[in-house]
């Protein structure tokens, strides 16, 4: 069976200093979001990204990929609120994962795997979005 070594040096650096984070971090660390349904992106998001003003900041570039900021997550204890755009909000609950999950980066060019972070929590959004009035 094929195998590959896992480099945990990046994760060790992250646990020693929170200033060196390479992932989006919450007060509880990196988290998984579980939503019901799908997030629909605009079909012409590439042209929207070119027209995006720095003040809006909905689009950014990382490693040649266009990233879309679709919302704002607020966590208050065990409750979470996800604002999607300016029209909807989701109410959710923060839960601890039974088994922590490792976030890994696979580099197929040199056949290496890097442990980037470990998730211990997830936010579950069970209900339909609520309109923002």
UniProtKB/Swiss-Prot annotation:
One annotated Gene Ontology cellular component of this protein: Ctf18 RFC-like complex
Subcellular location: Nucleus
Molecular function GO labels: DNA binding
GO terms, biological process: DNA replication; maintenance of DNA trinucleotide repeats; mitotic sister chromatid cohesion; telomere tethering at nuclear periphery
Domain of life, per lineage: Eukaryota
Entry keywords, A to Z: Cell cycle, DNA replication, DNA-binding, Nucleus
Family: Belongs to the CTF8 family.
Function noted in UniProt: Essential for the fidelity of chromosome transmission. Required for the DNA replication block checkpoint. Component of the RFC-like complex CTF18-RFC which is required for efficient establishment of chromosome cohesion during S-phase and may load or unload POL30/PCNA. During a clamp loading circle, the RFC:clamp complex binds to DNA and the recognition of the double-stranded/single-stranded junction stimulates ATP hydrolysis by RFC. The complex presumably provides bipartite ATP sites in which one subunit supplies a catalytic site for hydrolysis of ATP bound to the neighboring subunit.
Quaternary state and interactors: Component of the CTF18-RFC complex, which consists of CTF18, CTF8, DSCC1, RFC2, RFC3, RFC4 and RFC5.
Protein name, as recorded: Chromosome transmission fidelity protein 8
Gene behind the chain: CTF8
